[in-house]
Regions:
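Active-site PLP attachment segment
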Residues: 152-172
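Helix C-cap/helix->beta junction micro-motif
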Residues: 66, 126-127, 156
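Short acidic capping loops at alpha-helix termini that bridge into adjacent secondary structure
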Residues: 20-25, 45-48, 95, 156-158
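Conserved coil-to-alpha-helix start sites within the AMP-binding
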Residues: 31-36, 55-59
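A short helix-loop-beta submotif of the ANL/AMP-binding
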Residues: 64-71
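Conserved PLP-anchoring active-site segment centered on the Schiff-base-forming lysine
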Residues: 24, 41-63
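Active-site phosphate-binding strand-loop segment of PLP-dependent enzymes
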Residues: 71, 75-146
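N-terminal small-domain helix-loop-helix segment of the aminotransferase-like
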Residues: 1-30, 37, 87
């Protein structure tokens, strides 16, 4: 299949309530490359990226490579590993360029309720930074596929990362 055919099939597969067209799909050699491309496009030296703890180490590695700062927000095990939105709000600064959200989360297994997802999207929209939605495990949640965060606000600045290898249990 051609790249255009692949993009069309990915757009159909990932839509789930988000109007998807091939011009909204970027093919990369893996999610890691997509994350690196997005961060390099969005972040300048000295900027800040809000990153959950625990996190996927690539986010902090790429942020450091850009000479930007990873600002960690907590996910609370006492609250099902959900992010503390008030704490995230307190960590934001004029240099904040992105908010990383890993949902479903690895390694915690947390799947965020729509109310939390909406609050996170609202933060990004209101304060002018991009929400990086790491949704690579979206097809592997115990309760069935997790709808993309972007469906909650089609105008919000959301970049969603998916992974066919994770969806088909063939990572590596």
């Amino acid at each position: 299949a051609s790249a255009d055919e692949a993009k069309a099939r990915i757009a159909d597969f990932t839509a789930r309530g988000v109007p998807m067209t091939t011009d909204r799909v970027v093919l990369t050699s893996g999610t890691s490359e997509g994350i690196e491309i997005a961060l390099n496009a969005l972040v300048e030296p000295g900027d800040e990226v809000l990153v959950p703890m625990p996190t996927y180490p690539l986010y902090t590695a790429v942020t450091a490579k850009i000479a930007a700062k990873a600002v960690y927000y907590r996910t609370d095990p006492a609250c099902g590993w959900l992010p503390d939105v008030d704490q995230i709000r307190s960590l934001m600064s004029p240099r904040t360029r992105a908010l990383v959200v890993i949902d479903p989360n690895n390694p915690t297994g947390a799947v965020y309720p729509d109310a939390v997802r909406r609050e996170l999207i609202e933060l990004a929209s209101r304060h002018g930074f991009v929400l990086l939605a790491d949704e690579v495990y979206g097809d592997l949640a115990y309760d069935g596929p997790t709808p993309p965060m972007a469906r909650l606000d089609l105008d919000a600045p959301v970049i969603s990362f998916g992974s066919l290898s994770k969806a088909y249990l063939a990572p590596g």
